[in-house]
């Protein structure tokens, strides 16, 4: 879980700096529509991997989905902590 918080900080820096030759910066430059397209693609790949009962592929695709979801959260100025707090509300 700690790494997800580190990744969030990396993503915020990429959004701020928009370095050349950065996949993440390219996503931010493409705006919310490009990011949403990637989230949708990765969600579909997670579904297929799960349907195929392929744990290795599911792990890979879930990582891709989590990454792109974090990019979306940063783009929308939300944090993982915001999501965790919502989950806590639902389960308390």
Swiss-Prot record:
Localization per record: Cytoplasm
Keyword annotations of the record: Amino-acid biosynthesis, ATP-binding, Cytoplasm, Histidine biosynthesis, Hydrolase, Nucleotide-binding
Reaction catalysed by this enzyme: 1-(5-phospho-beta-D-ribosyl)-ATP + H2O = 1-(5-phospho-beta-D-ribosyl)-5'-AMP + diphosphate + H(+)
Matches recorded under Pfam families: PRA-PH
Matches recorded under SUPFAM superfamilies: all-alpha NTP pyrophosphatases
Record carries keyword Hydrolase: yes
EC number assigned by the record: 3.6.1.31
Segments forming a coiled coil: none
Family label: Belongs to the PRA-PH family.
NCBIfam families: histidine_hisI, PRK00400.1-3
Protein name as catalogued: Phosphoribosyl-ATP pyrophosphatase
Organism of origin: Leptospira borgpetersenii serovar Hardjo-bovis (strain JB197)
């Amino acid at each position: 879980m700690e790494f997800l918080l580190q990744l969030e900080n990396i993503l915020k820096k990429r959004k701020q700096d928009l370095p050349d030759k950065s996949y993440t910066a390219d996503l931010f430059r493409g705006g919310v529509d490009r990011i949403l397209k990637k989230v949708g693609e990765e969600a579909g790949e997670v579904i297929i991997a799960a349907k195929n009962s392929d744990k290795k592929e599911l792990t890979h695709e879930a990582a891709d989905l989590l990454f792109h979801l974090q990019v979306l959260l940063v783009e929308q100025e939300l944090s993982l902590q915001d999501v965790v707090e919502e989950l806590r509300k639902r389960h308390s």
